[in-house]
Amino acid sequence: MAIELLYDADADLSLIQGRKVAIVGYGSQGHAHSQNLRDSGVEVVIGLREGSKSAEKAKEAGFEVKTTAEAAAWADVIMLLAPDTSQAEIFTNDIEPNLNAGDALLFGHGLNIHFDLIKPADDIIVGMVAPKGPGHLVRRQFVDGKGVPCLIAVDQDPTGTAQALTLSYAAAIGGARAGVIPTTFEAETVTDLFGEQAVLCGGTEELVKVGFEVLTEAGYEPEMAYFEVLHELKLIVDLMFEGGISNMNYSVSDTAEFGGYLSGPRVIDADTKSRMKDILTDIQDGTFTKRLIANVENGNTELEGLRASYNNHPIEETGAKLRDLMSWVKVDARAETA
């Protein structure tokens, strides 16, 4: 079934322009949403916890900063862009007591709604606007007169206006310039988590790490292994990003293409696909989310242990030394997402 694409001509920008919007969180997405909304003629305030380091950044950008509770009381549209694992607490303590019938609670990701970690009253509009790109790209494309495609979804629609309101919001941040795709909270949540775990983060990270180990354990220099399994990965991903897998295969050498066809299925085989299906099941039935919440309730001990183990892998030390030789690589790429 073909997806439905909506554009600026399908959106009524006046719907969001007639609302007071609180952006809760001023990170990668928060700064982009708030600035794009303001440039589209929407009244915006920023809601942050007391003592937040982001408050000064928001003020420097010209925004009024309130506590999250104050922002929720002031607004009739609240976009919750805080980290997934803190959203339920923020909702319970600061947002829920300040909601009125007909207010809209929006999300950039569906996890907390889909898995019932947040349960707004029935008279509250619940929707999602999820740009398919990082915040700095959402902002840069908007300034350039373009946009980043967005997903929108509706979970509760007591007024019959939720779809139009989420589309209006998406248009105000530039999404309808590129195309807005209506979906569901379930589809966005499950596919997003699966992509992160099985392919983008978990799968790719393990593939790179194990490839490095195979080469170094066979006696090859760590620097050579790093270049071949990690450094050149960007070239391949960029080619796929720009024109698909066929474009990548067209662009590499015949030797690389032929070897890839032969060896790829030996690495990612039917057993791998079966385990990926198991990962999908764990996401769908809530197993992963329960473990995520348990980790938070236990002070992030499991996450911190995993993080330390991965950060101490030999590929990290090798990579740090080699990146110092590359003037075109940012000294601290993490600053981009801070």
Swiss-Prot record:
Q: What positions constitute the catalytic site? A: H109
Q: Which Gene3D superfamilies match?
A: 6.10.240.10, NAD(P)-binding Rossmann-like Domain (3.40.50.720)
Q: How is the cofactor bound?
A: Binds 2 magnesium ions per subunit.
According to the UniProt record, which cysteines are disulfide-bonded?
none
Per the record, the GO terms for biological process are: isoleucine biosynthetic process; L-valine biosynthetic process
Q: Which GO cellular component terms are attached?
A: cytosol
**List of residues binding substrate:** S253
Q: Which UniProt keywords apply?
A: Amino-acid biosynthesis, Branched-chain amino acid biosynthesis, Magnesium, Metal-binding, NADP, Oxidoreductase
Q: Which residues form the KARI N-terminal Rossmann domain?
A: 3-183
- Sequence positions that bind NADP(+): Y26, G27, S28, Q29, R49, S52, S54, D84, T85, S86, Q87, G135
The record, for Pfam families, names:
KARI_C, KARI_N
Its domain of life reads Bacteria
Q: Which residue intervals define the domain KARI C-terminal knotted in the entry?
A: 184-329
Identify the residues that bind Mg(2+) 2: D192, E228, E232
Provide the cofactor list for this protein.
Mg(2+)
What is its pathway? Amino-acid biosynthesis; L-isoleucine biosynthesis; L-isoleucine from 2-oxobutanoate: step 2/4; Amino-acid biosynthesis; L-valine biosynthesis; L-valine from pyruvate: step 2/4
Where along this sequence does the record place binding of Mg(2+) 1? D192, E196
Q: EC number(s) per UniProt?
A: 1.1.1.86
Catalysed reaction(s) here are:
(2R)-2,3-dihydroxy-3-methylbutanoate + NADP(+) = (2S)-2-acetolactate + NADPH + H(+); (2R,3R)-2,3-dihydroxy-3-methylpentanoate + NADP(+) = (S)-2-ethyl-2-hydroxy-3-oxobutanoate + NADPH + H(+)
The record's function comment reads: Involved in the biosynthesis of branched-chain amino acids (BCAA). Catalyzes an alkyl-migration followed by a ketol-acid reduction of (S)-2-acetolactate (S2AL) to yield (R)-2,3-dihydroxy-isovalerate. In the isomerase reaction, S2AL is rearranged via a Mg-dependent methyl migration to produce 3-hydroxy-3-methyl-2-ketobutyrate (HMKB). In the reductase reaction, this 2-ketoacid undergoes a metal-dependent reduction by NADPH to yield (R)-2,3-dihydroxy-isovalerate.
- HAMAP family reported for this sequence: IlvC
Protein family membership: Belongs to the ketol-acid reductoisomerase family.
What is the protein's name according to its record?
A: Ketol-acid reductoisomerase (NADP(+))
